Amino acid sequence: MNTKPGVFLECEERTKRNLEALKRSLRTKLGDSFDTLIGDQACVYVTGSMGRLEMGVKSDLDAYTVRFDGSGEDSSSLEEAVRHANKEVGLPPLDSNGKYVKTVSASSLLDLLGSPRDDSEGVLTKRMLLVLESRVLLGQSAYDKLVGQVIDAYWQNDDLHPKGYQPFVLVNDIIRYWRIPNCQ
């Protein structure tokens, strides 16, 4: 028996339909280039209301593309496929002309962990969105690897505390992500 109120069920069902439609559109658009652009070295994932399965009728797509190989492979066709799928599914235009769809390296989500630039370059937000509220569109194996590496990065000091290591850096990042700025 489902105990969710009707409005939440509607949002969840709408989101699942949109996720499947986006996946189909992306696969079709990429066609023969899928293995080259995605394979097991890249992924496309969504966050925001789609990642939380709570899309409203006016919700937009918050998609990210990440590569592991750092090969310099031109990912513009992958980014264009995301834009095309967004339009084909009938979602609102991407925020900021789709700047978040721009492909980033997996290492960029890890290299700044704990540094002052983590916030200023928006990496903390990308990392927290990935861990807390993301769903994969394409590249399941790369997505799983990415999430695993991000989580593992928060346990990098566990060998220094063999009895009862607590991931305080992760807890701190979650707090920083959710903190409301102190406006004066």
Model-inferred region functions:
Residues 1-7:
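Long, non-coiled-coil amphipathic alpha-helical linker/lever segments
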Residues 3, 45-48, 136, 161:
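Generic detector of intrinsically disordered, low-complexity, polar/charged segments
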Residues 13, 17-37, 73-176:
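Conserved catalytic core of two-metal-ion nucleotidyltransferases
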Residues 23-74:
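Active-site nucleotide-donor binding segment shared across nucleotidyl transfer reactions
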Residues 65, 177-184:
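Extended alpha-helical coiled-coil/bundle linker/stalk regions that scaffold oligomerization
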